[in-house]
Amino acid sequence: MNQNLIEVKNLTFKRGDRVIYDNLNLQVKKGKITAIMGPSGIGKTTLLKLIGGQLMPEQGEILFDGQDICRLSNRELYEVRKRMGMLFQSGALFTDISTFDNVAFPIREHTHLPENLIRQIVLMKLEAVGLRGAAALMPSELSGGMARRAALARAIALDPDLIMFDEPFTGQDPISMGVILSLIKRLNEALNLTSIVVSHDVEEVLSIADYAYIIADQKVIAEGTSEQLLQSQDLRVVQFLKGESDGPVRFKYPAQDYVKELFE
């Protein structure tokens, strides 16, 4: 039995002439939290869109539970996406409907359940993230942390197999960040989810990740458990994890001789 829910094999993706990924390979194990980290601008969010079938690669395979996302028909892809939840960096709540209706939206969209059952499911999901009492509030009445939790409740509304988190800790105060960290870990275990967490917050994401990848230079440059990565001697990994300003990734953008340019 295959233990991987996601397998990315020999993936190449370009935007115009710019190569984002060149022969990228990674796996996401079922029931585990996998972190994807790397410098800004290397395409981590793009990778989530590729896994979700929103973008198509130039070559390679993206297997979701054995099915190649790149070869599915629109109808097949629609069915597969029901098994995926996405927590966007912005939360992406609908601003003109209540918190309750935001969580109910995917259930109403993808099922034919009666409203009384939908109500029970929505209240259960809101209870799981601590927001059952905020069901009637509009998104504008929620704090940033509450909005992120409401978006998480919506992401788990259909009991997906996979949840993808895009920078879930961005803009969160320490308390909200701690709550979201706890929720990701607790829900992953309680609901037997598989989670992919894209984040720049090294310490936080490594505290909950079962396995992690660091992506740079169009490919995976390091992978392993949190302990293995923290013990890495690769200078690129050390610079990224410690947040050092200079190293293999130079502080100064390449330029001609400074004195020569000043007095030209």
UniProtKB/Swiss-Prot annotation:
Pfam families: ABC_tran. ATP binds at G38, P39, S40, G41, I42, G43, K44, T45. The keyword Membrane applies. One of its GO terms (molecular function) is ATP hydrolysis activity. Its EC number is 7.6.2.-. Gene3D superfamilies: P-loop containing nucleotide triphosphate hydrolases. InterPro entries: AAA+_ATPase, ABC_transporter-like_ATP-bd, ABC_transporter-like_CS, P-loop_NTPase. It is found in: Cell inner membrane. The keyword Electron transport does not apply. GO terms for cellular component: plasma membrane. It is an enzyme of class 7 (translocase). Keywords: ATP-binding, Cell inner membrane, Cell membrane, Membrane, Nucleotide-binding, Translocase, Transport. Belongs to the ABC transporter superfamily. MlaF family. Part of the ABC transporter complex MlaFEDB, which is involved in a phospholipid transport pathway that maintains lipid asymmetry in the outer membrane by retrograde trafficking of phospholipids from the outer membrane to the inner membrane. Responsible for energy coupling to the transport system. The complex is composed of two ATP-binding proteins (MlaF), two transmembrane proteins (MlaE), two cytoplasmic solute-binding proteins (MlaB) and six periplasmic solute-binding proteins (MlaD). This is Intermembrane phospholipid transport system ATP-binding protein MlaF. The gene is mlaF.
